[in-house]
């Protein structure tokens, strides 16, 4: 297992211009893969004597280059310079970069150091959703104005394999359908293809850098109770409107919420976009595309289809389509398909 010492952390801080006689370290997160991908991600809260606490990130990801890591840091700093609250990332002393190349525990790794942000957002309510939407819109404005780019794939690109809806996984189930269910599956597939053809102009829009994961655990409250964000690990280039729609539904459905919540998912969606449009109004073309993109996301939402990531399928909920297919229950399959078809042909306006 990967290990590091206080002496190692002191040397890292020295590279960032922090000279402290002692420090305290608390490991907050670790992903140390022993399989062939060999990925490593360790996040450590380091408090040097006489200095505010910092977050030191140690990474070894064979799929992400130093160029990508540095671009993510520079994008975060570009937002901060334009007034967007982020965790400031320290530059390496005497060098025009933020990512430090280091050898730790006989392993070459990339290292960054950034400010530790207090007051992490713990749950999302309507007011918080408005603020998250506003924050995202402001960051989009800066990214577009400053022509920011990060050469990395994102989680929420609706024209690629993504983390919110599984249209391609739905299509792969076609060879397990029979009778009327096979016919309905084909009708859904055709409607999906028609919608994606209509969305093609959206696909062709220019892409700009986005933070890529505006979740509760990546956001913090500022001293005046606005919201900022940190963790640009998933930052990359996306069509800004697509990022807005995907992030809005992500915030409304897959966050932590108050136990005594009195609001619906749709209340959160509307709140998020109310905040977003206050800083970056949707264009008439956006409003035309929204019902189509929303229909695809709602129909093939992860919980509707079932997980198929990694080795084989692992349905996340019993009511997922794949669960019905796996149970060889044609009536349940039909109900799921009808629900998916109804969502795909619904046209929710913004």
Regions found by a protein language model. Name each.
Residues 35-51, 55, 194-242, 348:
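Active-site acidic catalytic loop and adjacent metal/ATP-binding pocket
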Residues 241-280, 296-313:
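Active-site activation/catalytic loop segments of kinase-like enzymes and analogous catalytic loops
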Residues 1-91, 223, 344-350:
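Conserved NTP-binding catalytic cores of kinases and kinase-like/nucleotidyltransferase enzymes
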Residues 163-219:
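Loop-centered beta-sheet repeat module
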Residues 300-350:
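ATP/Mg2+ or Mg2+-diphosphate-binding catalytic cores
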Residues 95, 107-123, 170-173, 298-315:
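A glycine-centered beta->alpha junction motif in the catalytic cores
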Residues 123-182, 207:
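A cross-family kinase active-site recognition segment
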Residues 51-150:
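ATP-binding pocket architecture of kinase catalytic cores
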């Amino acid at each position: 297992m990967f290990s590091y010492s206080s002496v190692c952390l002191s040397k890292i801080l020295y590279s960032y211009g922090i000279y402290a006689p002692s420090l305290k370290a608390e490991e907050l997160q670790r992903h140390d893969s022993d399989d062939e991908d060999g990925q490593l991600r360790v996040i450590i809260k380091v408090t040097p004597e006489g200095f505010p606490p910092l977050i030191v990130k140690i990474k070894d990801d064979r799929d992400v280059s130093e160029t990508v890591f540095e671009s993510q840091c520079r994008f975060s700093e570009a937002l901060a310079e334009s007034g967007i609250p982020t965790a400031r990332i320290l530059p390496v002393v005497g060098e025009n970069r933020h990512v430090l190349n280091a050898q730790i525990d006989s392993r070459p790794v990339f290292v960054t150091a950034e400010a530790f942000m207090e007051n992490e957002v713990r749950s999302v309510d309507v007011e918080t959703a408005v603020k998250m939407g506003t924050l995202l819109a402001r960051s989009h404005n800066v990214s577009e104005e400053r022509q920011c780019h990060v050469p990395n794939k994102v989680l929420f690109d609706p024209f690629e394999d993504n983390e919110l809806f599984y249209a391609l996984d739905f299509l792969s189930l076609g060879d397990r359908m029979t009778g009327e269910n096979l016919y309905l599956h084909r009708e859904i597939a055709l409607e999906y293809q028609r919608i994606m053809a209509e969305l093609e102009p959206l696909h062709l829009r220019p892409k700009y850098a986005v933070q890529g994961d505006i979740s509760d655990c990546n956001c913090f409250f500022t001293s005046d109770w606005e919201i900022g964000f940190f963790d640009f690990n998933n930052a990359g280039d996306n069509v800004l409107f697509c990022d807005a729609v995907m992030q809005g539904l992500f915030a409304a459905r897959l966050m932590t919420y108050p136990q005594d919540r009195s609001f619906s998912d749709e209340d959160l969606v509307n709140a998020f976009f109310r905040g977003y449009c206050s800083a970056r109004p949707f264009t008439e073309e956006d409003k035309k595309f929204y019902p189509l993109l929303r229909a695809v996301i709602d129909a093939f939402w992860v919980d509707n289809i079932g997980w198929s990531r990694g080795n084989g399928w692992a349905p996340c909920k019993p009511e997922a389509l794949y669960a019905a297919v796996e149970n060889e229950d044609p009536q349940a399959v039909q109900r799921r398909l009808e629900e998916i078809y109804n969502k795909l042909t619904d046209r929710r306006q913004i």
